[in-house]
A protein has these predicted regions:
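Ligand-binding clamshell of periplasmic/extracellular solute-binding protein-like
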Residues: 38-45, 65-140, 155-167, 230-240, ...
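Glycine-centered hinge/linker elements that transmit conformational signals in sensory
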Residues: 236, 240-247, 281-371, 398-400, ...
C-alpha cells in the first residue's frame, strides 16, 4: 500500500506524461474490467444494475470499459486497504474519515483533462463542495475541504430533507392546497401572495383568492380562506401557527392530530438565517449552536465586500467574514437577520411543552412532538401529527399503507413580510398569537401579505432556502488496480452525467444535474406526489453536521442532551451551553479539516 502511494506521489512530482492530453492522468492501459461496489435496497439495486447495463451496452463499448456491479451491505476501511474495487459509492457521512487517511485517488486532473459530459457548473455548488478535500495538510496543519480543494469524490445524487403532510387533515381543516413556484405565482395565481401558508379574509363578501378555496373558521374565530402552497416555504411564524392549528391543546381537543408537526433536525431554521452549530474565525472552529450575534443579508444591488470577500445581492454573509469585519453592524447594503440563537430557540420552542410538568424547567410552544419523529408519526396511534420532516426516499415507507393520503412540501425558510406575520390578542404570548389575515386591517392599515424588500434594490428579505441532504458520491480507491484508474474514471463521469443520472432518478433520489432535477421527467417519478418540492429543496441542500469533519463523533457528546433534555424542557439553552460548549469546543479543536466556502 505504501509503495503504491509513493509511486503515485513521485509521478505527480515529476509530471510524467504531462505532454499527452489523455494520458496525463495515468491509469490507462488496463483491462477495462471495472468492479463497482455500492450499497442499496433491493429495488434501488435493480435500478443501479439497469444503469450499469446501459453503460456496458452503450458508452462503455466506446470507452472500452466493462463494469460489474456488487451491491454490498457496507464498505469498510479494510475494503479500501488491499485489493479494493475500482469504483465505490459512499455517503457524505463516510467520505471524510477515509479521505484524511488517503484512501481515495485525487480526481482533479481527470476532471480537468477528460470531463466527458460531466460538468460541475451544471450541479449545485453544495454537491461538489461536499466531496472536495485536499490530499494533504497545509503549512498550518489544516486540511482544506470544500471550494478550491482537490476533487476526491463525484456527487451522485442526494436524498434531501422535505416535509410530509397529511392531505386529509389539511382538507378537513378547510385548507386549499396548491402547487406553484414563487416565480410563477403572479401569472398563475394573481390573487395570491408568496406564502407557504396564508389566510385571506372571507368577510364582507370577499371572494376566494383562488378557485376552489372555501370559507372556514381560523383559530381567532374569523371567516377566512386558507391556502397552503407546497412549493413555497413557510416562514417561521406560519409554520408554528399551522402547527398550532393541528395541536389538540390549542383547539379544545378538536384537532384530529395530537400535534401539528414533528421536526428532528434544526438545519432549515439555523442555516436559513446564516447560522450553524460551528463557526470558523479564520484560525479555529467554535461551537456556535446558540451564537447570539446577528447575521446579515446582502441587499445592495451591486453587492458588498465583507472582510475582503465580495457578496452578491441576496447572499448571506459567512460567519468568518462577519466576525472579522469589525464595523459590519453599520455597513451599508446589509440587512440584519436573526442570530443562530434566535433561530435555534424557535426550533426548540416547537417541541418544549407549553406547561411545566415532572421536573421541566422551561416552557415553549408545545406544538410538535419530539418523542416520535419518524415518518409514521403522520398516521401513528399516539403522538399523531399533521406534518413531519423526513427525506424523499421515505416515500417508499409511506406508499405501502398510505398511498394518496399524504404529499410533500418544502422546509421552512426565514421570510419577512410587510407589517410582520402575526398579531396578538392581549398579552404577547404564543397562546395569544395569531397569523395576520390578508385583506384585514391591523392598526389602521390593510395587511397585504407582500414580501418585505429593500427599498432601493428590491432584494427580498429572505434567508437561505436550505436543509440537510444525505449525499452520495463515487470514488476511485487509490489501492485499486492503478492500470484501470482511467477506465474507472470514464464510468464515473458517465454515471454522474445527465445520461447516467436519467436512469438513477428512478430510485427517487434527486439527481446531481440541476436541469434534470427540476425537469418534468424527475417530477413524474413521484407518480402524483410533489417531487418538484424535493428537487427544489435539493438545490439548497447541505451536508449535515455529522459530515462536517473526519466523522460525526464530535456531535455525539452533546446531541443526546440537545434532542432530549433541551427539546423537552428539562434544561435551558443557557444550562445546555454551560454543560456542553466546553466539551464540544474540545472535540472541535481536535479536527484539522476546514470547510472552505461554507458559512
Amino acid at each position: 500500500m505504501k509503495g503504491k502511494k509513493a509511486a503515485i506521489a513521485l509521478a505527480a512530482i515529476m509530471g510524467f506524461g504531462a505532454v499527452a492530453s489523455l494520458g496525463a492522468c495515468g491509469g490507462s492501459g488496463g483491462s477495462g474490467e471495472i468492479d463497482f461496489w455500492y450499497s442499496a435496497s433491493v429495488p434501488d439495486g435493480r435500478i443501479i444494475s439497469e444503469m450499469i447495463d446501459a453503460y456496458n451496452n452503450g458508452q462503455g463499448k466506446e470507452d472500452g470499459v466493462h463494469v460489474t456491479g456488487d451491491n454490498r451491505g457496507s464498505v469498510s476501511r479494510t475494503d479500501l486497504m488491499v485489493n479494493s474495487p475500482n469504483v465505490i459509492m459512499l455517503s457524505d457521512e463516510q467520505f471524510k474519515q477515509f479521505a484524511v487517511e488517503d484512501y481515495y485517488l485525487d480526481l482533479t486532473q481527470y476532471y480537468e483533462e477528460m470531463p466527458g459530459n460531466y460538468k460541475e457548473e451544471e450541479i449545485p455548488t453544495s454537491f461538489t463542495r461536499a466531496f472536495r478535500i485536499d490530499t494533504k495538510d497545509d503549512a498550518n496543519g489544516k486540511r482544506m475541504a470544500g471550494e478550491g480543494a482537490a476533487i476526491q469524490g463525484i456527487p451522485f445524487g442526494v436524498d434531501p430533507m422535505i416535509y410530509y403532510y397529511s392531505i386529509d387533515v389539511f382538507e378537513e381543516a378547510g385548507i386549499k392546497i396548491i402547487s406553484c413556484e414563487e416565480k410563477d405565482l403572479e401569472k398563475k395565481y394573481p390573487g395570491l401572495q408568496p406564502h407557504g401558508y396564508a389566510e385571506y379574509t372571507a368577510e364582507n363578501g370577499a371572494k376566494p383568492p383562488v378557485e376552489g378555496a372555501t370559507v372556514s373558521e381560523n383559530l381567532a374565530g374569523e371567516s377566512v380562506y386558507k391556502i397552503f402552497n407546497n412549493l413555497i416555504p413557510m416562514n417561521f411564524e406560519e409554520f408554528r401557527y399551522l402547527s398550532k392549528c393541528f395541536t389538540k391543546s390549542y383547539t379544545d381537543n378538536d384537532s384530529t392530530t395530537d400535534y401539528g408537526s414533528a421536526t428532528h433536525h434544526w438545519f432549515s431554521f439555523g442555516w436559513s438565517v446564516g447560522g450553524d452549530c460551528v463557526g470558523y474565525d479564520g484560525e479555529k472552529y467554535s461551537f456556535t449552536a446558540l451564537d447570539s450575534s446577528a447575521n446579515y443579508l446582502v441587499t445592495a444591488k451591486d453587492g458588498v465586500t465583507v472582510n475582503g470577500k465580495h457578496y452578491a445581492a441576496g447572499e448571506v454573509v459567512r460567519y468568518e467574514d462577519k466576525v472579522k469585519q469589525a464595523d459590519i453592524a453599520t455597513m451599508q447594503g446589509l440587512h440584519p437577520l436573526p442570530s443562530q440563537q434566535t433561530a435555534m430557540q424557535e426550533f426548540i420552542n416547537l417541541s418544549v411543552p407549553r406547561d411545566k410538568t415532572g421536573g421541566m424547567v422551561a416552557t415553549g410552544y408545545g406544538v410538535a412532538t419530539a418523542i416520535n419523529e419518524s415518518v409514521d408519526a403522520l398516521y401513528s396511534a399516539s403522538n399523531k401529527v399533521a406534518m413531519v420532516s423526513g427525506r424523499i426516499v421515505q416515500t417508499t415507507t409511506l406508499e405501502v399503507a398510505y398511498k394518496g393520503q399524504y404529499d410533500i412540501a418544502l422546509p421552512t425558510q426565514w421570510r419577512e413580510y410587510k407589517g410582520g406575520s402575526v398579531y396578538y390578542k392581549g398579552e404577547e404570548t404564543f397562546g395569544n398569537e395569531y397569523l395576520k389575515v390578508i385583506g384585514k386591517q391591523y392598526a389602521g392599515t390593510v395587511y397585504t401579505g407582500e414580501l418585505d424588500k429593500d427599498a432601493e434594490s428590491g432584494v427580498p428579505f429572505v434567508g437561505r432556502q436550505t436543509g440537510y441532504g444525505s449525499f452520495s458520491a463515487l470514488m476511485i480507491p487509490v489501492n485499486s488496480d492503478s492500470s484501470n484508474y482511467e477506465a474507472a474514471w470514464k464510468f464515473i463521469r458517465w454515471a454522474a452525467s445527465e445520461e447516467g443520472q436519467r436512469i438513477y432518478i428512478k430510485t427517487g433520489n434527486v439527481p446531481n444535474q440541476s436541469a434534470l432535477a427540476l425537469s418534468d421527467e424527475y417530477a413524474a417519478i413521484g407518480s402524483g406526489l410533489n417531487y418538484r418540492a424535493a428537487a427544489i429543496a435539493a438545490q439548497g441542500a447541505e451536508i449535515g453536521d455529522w459530515a462536517y469533519f473526519n466523522n460525526g463523533a464530535w456531535v455525539d457528546k452533546w446531541s443526546g442532551n440537545f434532542n432530549q433534555a433541551l427539546r423537552l424542557g428539562y434544561t435551558t439553552p443557557e444550562k445546555f451551553m454551560q454543560d456542553f460548549a466546553g466539551i464540544a469546543n474540545t472535540d472541535i479543536g481536535k479536527v484539522s479539516i476546514v470547510m472552505n466556502g461554507r458559512w
